[in-house]
Amino acid sequence: PCCLVGSEMCIRDSDKTQLGIEAKKYMDDGLLVPDEVVIGMIGSQLESNNKSKGFIFDGFPRTTEQATALDNLLDKKEISISAMISLKVEDNELIKRLLERGKSSGRSDDQSEEIISNRIKEYNLKTSPLKSFYNNQNKLHEIEGIGSISDISNNINSVINSL
C-alpha cells in the first residue's frame, strides 16, 4: 500500500502554494487546517498514487467532515476505509513527548506547552468524535500507545494483517 501521511506532510510538501502557505499558518498556531484545504491536498495525493493497491493514512482524517469527504473521494475509486487505528495515550504523556520532540526536531509547534495544549483541545473537540464515526462502522481498533516502539508497532501490524 501507499502511505499518505495526512494533512501535515501534504501541507509541508506544498508550502509554496497559496493553500500550503495558508495551511501552514494554521498548523504553526496548533490549529486544524480547514477541511476544504486538506481535502483538496489529499485528493491530489490520491490522484498522484492512483495505481496503489491501498492507502494508509496517518493523521488524516481529523474531523468527521473530512472522513465523509474522504469516503466520497474513495467511493469514486471504488475503495473504502478498512480500519481506523487509534493509539491511546494520556494527555500529560502527549505533552511530555511533544516537548521532547520539539527539542530534537526544532519544530516550533512542539516547543510550547500552550500550543501543544491547544492542539490537544482541538483534538478532543474535532478529532476524537472520529472514534464513534468509525466504531459505528465496526472499523475502530484502539491500541495502547504506551510501551516500546516494537510492541506498539507489532500491535498495529497485527490489526493491519487481520484486514
Task: Specify the residue positions occupied by each region the protein language model found.
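A glycine- and Lys/Arg-enriched "phosphate-lid" helix/loop adjacent to the NTP-binding pocket
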Residues: K25-Y26, L74-K126
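NTP-dependent small-molecule kinase module
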Residues: S117, K121-L163
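Glycine-rich phosphate-binding loop used to anchor ATP phosphates in small-molecule kinases
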Residues: D29-L74
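Conserved nucleotide-binding/hydrolysis micro-motifs of P-loop NTPases
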Residues: S7-E8, P61-E65, V89-I95, K103, ...
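Single conserved hydrophobic/aromatic residue that forms the stacking wall/gate
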Residues: P1-G6, C10-I11
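Structural signal for short hydrophobic segments within the conserved structured cores
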Residues: Y26, L31, A83, H141-I143
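P-loop NTPase switch/communication element
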Residues: D13-K25
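Residue-level signature of catalytic and energy-coupling elements of molecular machines
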Residues: G6, I42, I56, I85, ...
